[in-house]
Every structure is written in structure tokens, then in C-alpha cells.
From Swiss-Prot:
<keyword id="KW-1133">Transmembrane helix</keyword>
<keyword id="KW-0472">Membrane</keyword>
<protein>
    <recommendedName>
        <fullName>Uncharacterized protein MG452</fullName>
    </recommendedName>
</protein>
<dbReference type="Pfam" id="PF07667">
    <property type="entry name" value="DUF1600"/>
</dbReference>
<keyword id="KW-0812">Transmembrane</keyword>
<feature type="transmembrane region" description="Helical">
    <location>
        <begin position="31"/>
        <end position="51"/>
    </location>
</feature>
<feature type="transmembrane region" description="Helical">
    <location>
        <begin position="167"/>
        <end position="187"/>
    </location>
</feature>
<dbReference type="GO" id="GO:0005886">
    <property type="term" value="C:plasma membrane"/>
</dbReference>
<feature type="transmembrane region" description="Helical">
    <location>
        <begin position="213"/>
        <end position="233"/>
    </location>
</feature>
<dbReference type="InterPro" id="IPR011631">
    <property type="entry name" value="DUF1600"/>
</dbReference>
<feature type="transmembrane region" description="Helical">
    <location>
        <begin position="101"/>
        <end position="121"/>
    </location>
</feature>
<keyword id="KW-1003">Cell membrane</keyword>
<feature type="transmembrane region" description="Helical">
    <location>
        <begin position="130"/>
        <end position="150"/>
    </location>
</feature>
<feature type="transmembrane region" description="Helical">
    <location>
        <begin position="71"/>
        <end position="91"/>
    </location>
</feature>
Amino acid sequence: MLIIFKDLNLVKTNNCQIIGWWKQLSLPQKTFLSFIPLFLVTSAFVLTGIVESLLTFGTIIEQIDKFTDQTNVMLLIYAVIYTFNPKSWLLKNQQFFLSALAYILFTFIGYNLILSIAGIAYKSTNPYKLTSSIFLHVIAPIAFFIASFIKIKHEKDVNINMFFKSLLLFMIYPLIYGLYLVTIPYVRHYLFNGRPSTYTIYGSITNTKNNPFAWLVVFAVLFIYFPLSYLAIYLLQLKLIKKAIQPQFNLPFTLNKWKQK
């Protein structure tokens, strides 16, 4: 009986600690925490796709090289770090947050607009794959947008990198991914109905080997869409936290000095 009472006291103590921890969380943290189960589901879809790719093709590249899957896993990573360790160096100067927001925005727009126009989006009639696609391309991105808006509205006293530095850091991932995107058709092939075919990530729209128009698409996305979309998100953050815009766009010291001459 004594052991039972000790166990009950331990449970009560743990419950009190959990309640205390929950109360000290900010509203944005609570919002991201509430979405972690959703991001776990989308990451499970990604993991299932990797296993399926391994069993079907004997490799996992057909799954892990998808921008959608990479950015959805990024949402889970960010939500976990922000909720449980908001002072982490990974979250310094809002760089991870703004970048993740811009990346998942492209996942949302790229799939539901660009790939839909190209006739690639939502083609599967398999209920599981269709459900997975909706979660990855619609539900999870919208959830992150909601949580992000709440975070920006409620966290006014934040440090943000100067725009050009922030943009440079943001562009590292798209540029690396873009380089992979345009080169993979030249180096990887697979058999389709017994015939060798060019491997592309998103069909003809990214087939830089056989479709010259694909180069224009990739160039436009990398050097026009990504910088402009990041600029829009960056300005939105500044506006919502009522931070002066002009100082954030000052050129680096060396460029300013050269400009004055």
C-alpha cells in the first residue's frame, strides 16, 4: 500500500511539473507544440516513402531528393527546437525561422500552382498517396503559416540579421538543391519498361537534359522567386514587429565605403 501511495505522489509531482512547464510556455511555443503531432505525421509519411522507395527501387534517392519531403522534416525540427529549447543557437537571429517559412511557402506554391499547371500534382489515385500528398503540400504548410503568424505577432523583441546577410544564408540551401536538380538528369538513369530513361526529380519541368525550357524554370525559381519571396517574408516580419525597415537594408560596411567614394 505504501508503494502505491509513493507512486501516486510521484505521478502528482510529475503532473505538477508538466502543468508548470506548460504554463511558462509562450503562446507561440504552445501553438508550435500543438502542431508537433501533425509534423510527426507528415514526417512519418516521408519515412514511409523512403522505405517504399528502398523496397521498390533498391535505393532511397527517389524519395530523399524531394524538396517537399526535406522541407516538411524541417518543420518538425524547427517546431521541436523552438518549443523545447527556444534559446538554441540554431534559432539565432530568426534565420532558421524565416528560412523554413520561405522554403515551406515554396513547397505550398510550387506544388499547388506550378506542378498543378504542369499536370504533375495530385495525379495518384491511390488513397494513401493522395492523403500523404495533401498532408505534405497543404495541411502541414498551412499549420506552419498559422503558427508563424502567431509567433511574429507576439514576439516583438527579436534580433534579425541584416537583409543581405540573411538572404545570403537563406540562399545556400536552394542553390545547393538547384545544382543537384539541374545536374542529376545528366548523371542518373533508370529503366522504364526495359528502356533506359533520364532521371528527373519533377518530370519534364526539371529535365534539363532533354528540355531546354527546364533551365529557364530553374533559373527563374532560384534567382527571381526565392529572393523575392524571402524579401516579402522579411518585410512582413519587420512590419509586424514594428521594426525600422531602412537600417536593415544598409549595405555591408565595405560596400558602403566603396559607394561613398
